[in-house]
């Protein structure tokens, strides 16, 4: 099973850095005042996906207006790690826990993760609208919006052990060469099932795969063997 611990390595074009203006945050309540009830069927799932996309676009709009897109995507990466914990998701999904208590936990998350004020406001909007349950979907949608706005290619690298920065830089350069993207973000995941080596998934919705793992090599060897012809020594 893959480890939930993730790290991020970015390769970006050499452009002048943006001047981040954190002080001016637009209230998300005015930006996206909507609440959608989620049905327990396919239609409900589609509504949930639509809501996640809309919330993500609203947050991206605030980040663009504040010139804090890079800081906001960093916030999103932190939230991805926080809400990857099932206990956290279960806490916010529990209808017996009051909104006030959930807001207190949001405040703790904001402080411990050093999130921006508009990200904090965003999370509280989700709690008030009873949409915190789709935060992981919103994270994914925001990354898609960010990647499109910044011409960024996301590559997920899975390996048995943590790869060093020079190795990740080489992978980023290779993905950049293959895709022609201006920027490349490499997200790493520890996956012991690979035995050794690594895999790289990139492209739209991770449609392309480079598999350099020992697991893949063993599977290829196994598929070529005719096990019926193998005789074990006695």
Curated annotation (Swiss-Prot):
Modified-residue entries (N-acetylserine), positions: 48
Q: How does it sit in the membrane?
A: Peripheral membrane protein
| Database matches in Gene3D superfamilies | N-terminal domain of the delta subunit of the F1F0-ATP synthase (1.10.520.20)
What top-level branch of life does the organism fall under?
Answer: Eukaryota
Q: What happens when the gene is disrupted?
A: Seedling lethal. High-chlorophyll (Chl)-fluorescence phenotype associated with an increase in non-photochemical quenching of Chl fluorescence and a higher de-epoxidation state of xanthophyll cycle pigments under low light. Impaired electron flow in photosystems I and II.
Q: Which InterPro entries match?
A: ATP_synth_OSCP/delta_N_sf, ATPase_OSCP/d_CS, ATPase_OSCP/dsu
Enumerate the Gene Ontology biological process terms: photosynthesis; photosynthetic electron transport in photosystem I; photosynthetic electron transport in photosystem II; response to cold
Transit peptide endpoints, chain numbering: 1-47
User: Residues where Phosphothreonine occurs?
Assistant: 234
Give glycosylation sites per the record: 66
Q: What role is this protein assigned?
A: F(1)F(0) ATP synthase produces ATP from ADP in the presence of a proton or sodium gradient. F-type ATPases consist of two structural domains, F(1) containing the extramembraneous catalytic core and F(0) containing the membrane proton channel, linked together by a central stalk and a peripheral stalk. During catalysis, ATP synthesis in the catalytic domain of F(1) is coupled via a rotary mechanism of the central stalk subunits to proton translocation (Potential). Essential for photosynthesis, probably by facilitating electron transport in both photosystems I and II.
Assembly and partners? F-type ATPases have 2 components, F(1) - the catalytic core - and F(0) - the membrane proton channel. F(1) has five subunits: alpha(3), beta(3), gamma(1), delta(1), epsilon(1). CF(0) has four main subunits: a(1), b(1), b'(1) and c(10-14). The alpha and beta chains form an alternating ring which encloses part of the gamma chain. F(1) is attached to F(0) by a central stalk formed by the gamma and epsilon chains, while a peripheral stalk is formed by the delta, b and b' chains.
Similarity section: Belongs to the ATPase delta chain family.
What is this protein's record name? ATP synthase subunit delta, chloroplastic
Q: Which organism is it from?
A: Arabidopsis thaliana (Mouse-ear cress)
- Give the gene name: ATPD
